[in-house]
Amino acid sequence: MKKITVIDSHTGGEPTRLVIDGFPDLGRGSMAERLQILEREHDQWRRACVLEPRGSDVLVGALLCQPQAGDACAGVIFFNNSGYLGMCGHGTIGLVRSLYHLGRIDQGVHRIETPVGTVEATLHEDLSVSVRNVPAYRYRTQVMLQLPGHGKVHGDIAWGGNWFFLISDHGQRIALDNVEALTHYTRDVRQALEAAGITGAEGGVIDHIELFADDPQADSRNFVLCPGKAYDRSPCGTGTSAKLACLAADGKLAPGQAWRQASVIGSQFSAHYEKVGEQLIPILRGSAHISAEATLLLDDSDPFVWGIGS
């Protein structure tokens, strides 16, 4: 019987499962190198952790790793039901809150190594978390897609830790009771991008689709389709970072100016950015809540020990 020890949390409604023990040893390389080892040699552990029957399509996993640098409090590898994520904003907030719950960190600034770089996270007195993300930028603007049944659609391609296609003029109603239609629409967008060979820089796969609309309680409301066909319940940290990059490129948001991003379920992140040389550094703030302490049991006699669909 194999065992995986986890802490579950949610950030603005979006769950994170932090793996604190039980995965195979991945060595002492960088987080990017360890991700490659996990994906190439031990991917069944990801599947066991986040696929049904122990997980679900919406669940994001976060493997807690020993960092390389002495000034970092943790390393982390993010994954979901379809594969791996370079960075995850809501997951980083959940990670920090979980480490505090475990008594491993206190309030203050903490450095966290990810596969796409080191981020800084601040645990505040009210236990909200600010994340100083990796640099974000807009790669292309007003990219035209021919979408079957919807005609021409224009969007921006931006990096916020993952690749996003961001659409403001889409004609969709962003509301929780319209999630099924929004999911179909954004899947069509992703398929159209793939069919047209449209990518991020250096062929990066655009696996997140983000729609925006007005919101009476925030600067914007979004709907984000994540890899694996699930939608983000939170406002999406890397997606908000990509949005900041687009707003800055259009001259619509100044450094330090606050932006409040709402999700399709109404949860919110506050955000702003700083310029460091030519780089745009997003800073996001949100809250996570602990929902479970658990031990996942992997019984070799279980036909779905490594997940349904594995």
From Swiss-Prot:
Keywords: Isomerase. Its EC number is 5.1.1.8. It is an enzyme of class 5 (isomerase). The active site is at C88 (proton acceptor), C236 (proton donor). Disulfide bonds: none annotated. Catalyzes the epimerization of trans-4-hydroxy-L-proline (t4LHyp) to cis-4-hydroxy-D-proline (c4DHyp). Is likely involved in a degradation pathway that converts t4LHyp to alpha-ketoglutarate. Displays no proline racemase activity. NCBIfam families: PRK13970.1. This is 4-hydroxyproline 2-epimerase.
